[in-house]
Amino acid sequence: VSTTVFIVPGSIGDPAAPSGGNRYDRRIAEESARAGMPVRELPLDGAWPDPSGAERARLSRALDGLPDGTPVLVDGLVACGVPDVLAPAAARLRLAVLVHLPLADEGGLRAERAEAYERAEGAVLRAAVRVVATSGHAARDIARRHRLDPARVHTVEPGTDRAPLAPGTDGASRLLCVAAVTPRKGQDLLAEALGRNRDRRWTCVMAGPLPSEAASPGGPSRPTFAERVEERLGRHGIRDRVRFTGALGPSALDGEFACADLMVLPSRAETYGMVVSEALARGVPVLASGAGALPETVGRVSGGRVPGLLVPSGDASALAGALGRWWGDGALRVGLRAAARERRALLRSWRSAAADMARVLELLHGDRAAAEGTR
């Protein structure tokens, strides 16, 4: 079987830049190779999706150096902002694009930037032979918003690594939110919800990178989103009960999961939510928004039970109410923990995820053979 070139962000192995996308890319590459579909990672450094001229040229040279007809899978963070580079390459390579998150869905973007991302991404995906999304919800959304043939948009959901059951703290009080501190992940909503429950007994860990924010050209500097979240916590008098860890390595993150009683993910947009599966793999119930694919990721168990609580996206009042229910109802907590442990047994492996990706890559190789046969 010939090798697929997998172009990924250069940050894929950087412990200071953990992300669900990087973890997905690395695990899929590893397990695809084990499944007999060789994948060669090609990491490219760059400020993707907004590369410098030199970074854009480096991507162009990497693509130009591949023989005609080479099957190439490109992470959407690298691909979707540079249609001027990807579209010409797609004319001679067998190009697939893996979309972790539509670029325009990242929170905090100005309208004109979001519109530019949408146009660029659409041009790239329409040029590609195949598109891979990380959930059924995301695949349907991508096909609709970019007017793609749904038959070319494939779903490859992430897998989950096995993990020990989390002992927790006291079964109720320790909350864990694992996400980069950005508007899309909704930590401002969580801060407000916690403030409305300040009389309850709890602590919260917000584990994830604290991205910097560039000031507008010629404009005044403003607090980062993380600083604004901290300010809100301070107004409620609860800043000392919330710990921001910054980016964590695997062992440190395992330690935070082990102490967690409830995982909270109040995202405004989400194409999958791998940290939800990672919590459920440890038997930790989840309080999540209903954004995007999160209801699918949280899932259900026997009797239609949900292994956690779902609230409307962007609704701090609903989030506060759900937290109040969690702390105020011991029977509810027992039931949710039991459902989370049942869901744990149903989570799929990365081997299964890689098998799905292998089927897409086989189609990509078949596209190559068909193209060669028409010459």
Please place each PLM-identified region on the residue numbering:
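Membrane-proximal helix-turn-helix segments that form the acceptor-binding/catalytic region
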Residues: L103, E112-V131
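Carbohydrate-associated surface elements
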Residues: H137, G159
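Conserved donor-binding/catalytic core segment of Leloir-type glycosyltransferases
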Residues: A166-K185, A191-R196, V205-P209
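Glycosyltransferase donor-sugar binding loop
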Residues: T203-E230, G246
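Short alpha-helical donor nucleotide-sugar binding micro-motif in glycosyltransferases
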Residues: A247-L248, G255-A260
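Aromatic "clamp/platform" in nucleotide-sugar-dependent glycosyltransferases that forms part
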Residues: R268
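Short hydrophobic beta-strand element within catalytic cores of glycosyltransferases
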Residues: P285-A288, G292
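Conserved acidic donor-binding segment of nucleotide-sugar-dependent glycosyltransferases
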Residues: R300-A316, R325-G330
